[in-house]
Amino acid sequence: TFANNAVEAITGSPGIGLTRIAFRQFHGRNTEIHVADFDGHNAKRLTLDNSIAAGPEWTPNNNTLYYYSYRRHNPDIYSHNLQTGARRTVARYSGSNISPAVSPDGRRLAMVLSKAGSPDIWVGSANGTGLRRLTTTKEAESSPCWSPDGRWICFASRASGSTRLYKIPANGGAMSRIRTIGVVNATEPDWSPDGRAIVFTTMRGGGVFEICIVPPGGGNVEVLATGEDPSWAPNSRTLMFTKRSRGKRVLSVLDVPTKRVKTLPRSFPGNCSQAAWTK
């Protein structure tokens, strides 16, 4: 398409003109999941929970979204087929059931469950069965994401006191820290589709959030922009993230090599955050 070709001509990377995003939008005290084209057009509200719905995550075929919702007064994980509208419960245990992350082959789901005590990383099949607990720390784990080869899960943990990045084999094993030199707290990791980098959020003094990037093996951190909630586009060059502008949360696009930031051509009413790009 023209849009895809134009993006590729400018960036040298495959276009994103046909991609879509899912995100949460604030409606008073509630948040609902919405979907739209990556530029903000053709927006559609997906959930009508009149509650808190958050953490959208696409399946690789882009026809189903996972998210969690408080619609039953407890954070539970759901899958939502965008073609049929069918919604099913994936994880509904006592405590928190949040942060679903789909494996690259679409067959497995990582999530944060607190049914055994503190919030830990668990992995199960895509429908939530066959659960296996990966982390057993006494501290809170959060924000799991998969390596593109499906072998590793990266996440944030307070196991060492401050929140830092770790990885663990998806089939079980020891967790190891990903060094983020120059940053003392790191959360919300997202592994690039080409496997070359992990972006994450850090909080500086004064409550300022920054988007940073680090090699998957750890190392020096580069600050990309002020913001939070980073999500890679399929081209491993472009990020969607949340920027605070004039007291409002807006979705913005970042070209990683040039660090150029643009707000979406079509903005949404109200605050928006937690954008997730199609695979």
Where are each of the predicted segments found?
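Sequence signature of WD/YWTD-type beta-propeller architectures
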Residues: 1-279
